[in-house]
Amino acid sequence: MTEHYEVTVVGGGPAGLTAALYTTRLGHKTAVINRGGGRAAMMLDTHNVIGVTEEVSGNEFLQTAVEQVKSYGADYYQDLVVDIDQTDDGYRLTAGDTEVTSEHVVLATGFSDERPDPPLPRTGRGLHWCLHCDAYMFVDEPVFVMGTDDSAAHVAMIMLNFTSDVDLLTRGEEPEWSEETAALLESHPIEVVHEEIVGMEKDDDGWLTAFVFEDGTIEEYRGGFPMYGSDYNTDLAESLGVERNDDGTIAVDDHGRTNVDGVYAVGDVTPGHNQIPTAMGEGARCGIGNHYDLRAFPRSAEEIEEQGPVTEADVPGISEELLRHAVAHEGHAGGARNDRVATGDD
């Protein structure tokens, strides 16, 4: 039998899981379908998240979040959604081993960082993708920024706030930044290195220590930032007719609503800073927005005229399944009521 939900979140990063946490705790039957991986899962350490110590890895952070969401009654599927079809009363989501129907869909599909081409050897330590997350790590250290466009040049200049030793590496490609940006670069103490990288040196712990360039020179770096843009995961959004912005992100309102009724988007696939705390905030707003659009009460004057007054038999609005979870949860007022028989139980 195909399971039906009020809200189904596609993606299991900080934004999607926070949205699911809110919709579940606000009384809506919720599912998360997550393929796994993602930018947050790749983190060796967690930075800039109040209450989470830095030695917590991305996988540990996300696993804790998944367990929290499940503890409140949400269902979690490890699967890849390949298709979303509109139905008469919502949406049908098809994944490899999973098919569900849902009144609302939250797209939390994120993006992938564009990698250098040709690719560099992976170090795991020294190639970084988030300036606001990791710039602090390189205070007073030699740093590179890699790329040929305006954003790469501007990031190189931004890094001068943290260190005096910044190189901008074009890897043999012609710069594509504007004349205005070129003039700015000339007025900042940044060395532009045009030679291609042919090798990498690492220390015993696997941290990058230097790049070897095509002309034989060796330059020491503690780390840096490849800046080649983002590839937004919007295939599902496009199939639903969801509007996108010029930069490829999904256009949303303050609560994550898209131009398609019942479809929301949140996190890195939408405009804004690609940070865990901001993603969590967006997820919270999106979850609340879903609640605004789904909650049964208060009935409007038009609904009362059509359906009649709200009776005791109509309330509470929370589903019986989530009611059972709520009264048995350790967070329930007065403690978990495991001995309580929920509405609908024999």
What are these regions (language model features)?
Residues 20, 155, 266-320:
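A conserved FAD-binding loop/helix module that cradles the flavin
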